[in-house]
Amino acid sequence: MYTVLTGTPPFMASPLSEMYQNIREGHYPEPAHLSANARRLIVHLLAPNPAERPSLDHLLQDDFFTQGFTPDRLPAHSCHSPPIFAIPPPLGRIFRKVGQRLLTQCRPPCPFTPKEASGPGEGGPDPDSMEWDGESSLSAKEVPCLEGPIHLVAQGTLQSDLAGPEGSRRPEVEAALRHLQLCLDVGPPATQDPLGEQQPILWAPKWVDYSSKYGFGYQLLDGGRTGRHPHGPATPRREGTLPTPVPPAGPGLCLLRFLASEHALLLLFSNGMVQVSFSGVPAQLVLSGEGEGLQLTLWEQGSPGTSYSLDVPRSHGCAPTTGQHLHHALRMLQSI
């Protein structure tokens, strides 16, 4: 509740010992900008003594839930995407910032670097360091060249994905290659990408790659998360030492393959969605849908995600940087 209302967890401190002490003693920043009802509810929920915390029945009767305006219904995508208001700026921008504050997972894409492919004890970073980092950037002269040979520094598949005719690609890989090629078969290069729309999509904004030892884990935008062990899909531990993965919102949506090159991380999902995150200049693209419904969504540093159908780049072309990113993703899949 604290995180939803403020946009940050209540207990954040370094080192960890200080954070654990704050949890035990119930010390956290007081959100003075919230309403009095919201602050009282947070105080009750985060009481140091568990016996003083409200039960579910008492919680539902709290003034925070019983007073004020409550909409009759909400669209399904409101669970994983900030609202898009049809209001002219600057008021529209203010409302959108409020929505992004409530949905903290909807942030600019996180650059992937080869260091993140290392496991613990091998120079790899702490998993917490792989969260969104809107401050990371490189100048134009530091943009890495994506046209060199593809060298995969890490890759993995589901165990069931290993079966198939010798020397042949899996159908989902072939489909992803066709979709990427369709995006590249567009009109002449443009000076900038065409104007698109902001549409909610389900993708994986967070991941951690310890595949050398423990596996690859990711979290979807709706909060669903799971992982892949080095020798197959993740399964719940009976001893209770690991929590059961939260099922994603998409029906049967799971990660089939992940590929990491020196400049990008590619994720291929069971619904055919291709997600590519680039290092250097933070950029992210998601290719989803099938056939004429194919949709390309792009994120660049400091700008919200923009989506457009395949017909738009066919008629208006796309920026050279976008074409370079699509071509790099195509070559990554061709290298397996």
UniProtKB/Swiss-Prot annotation:
Keyword rRNA processing among UniProt keywords: no
Source domain of life: Eukaryota
Keyword check for Cytoplasm: yes
Tissues where the protein occurs: Expressed in the brain, neurons and glial cells. Also expressed in highly differentiated cells, such as the serous acini in the parotid gland, distal and proximal tubules of the kidney, tubules of the seminal gland, Kupffer cells and some hepatocytes in the liver, and some cells in the germinal center of lymph nodes (at protein level).
A single BP term in Gene Ontology: regulation of G1/S transition of mitotic cell cycle
Annotated keywords: Cell cycle, Cell division, Cytoplasm, Differentiation, Mitosis, Nucleus
Molecular functions (GO terms): ATP binding; protein kinase activity
Region (Disordered): 109-135, 224-245
Principal cellular location given in the protein's record: nucleus
Places the protein is found: Nucleus, Nucleolus; Cytoplasm
One GO CC annotation: centrosome
Domain POLO box, residue spans: 255-336
Domain Protein kinase: 1-65
Induction notes from the record: Down-regulated in primary brain tumors.
Family to which the UniProt record says this protein belongs: Belongs to the protein kinase superfamily. Ser/Thr protein kinase family. CDC5/Polo subfamily.
Domain comment (free text): The truncated protein kinase domain is predicted to be catalytically inactive; has lost the main activatory autophosphorylation site and the conserved key residues involved in phospho-substrate. The C-terminal region (containing the POLO box domain) is sufficient for inducing cell cycle arrest.
Protein task: Inactive serine/threonine-protein kinase that plays a role in cell cycle progression and neuronal differentiation.
Protein's UniProt name: Inactive serine/threonine-protein kinase PLK5
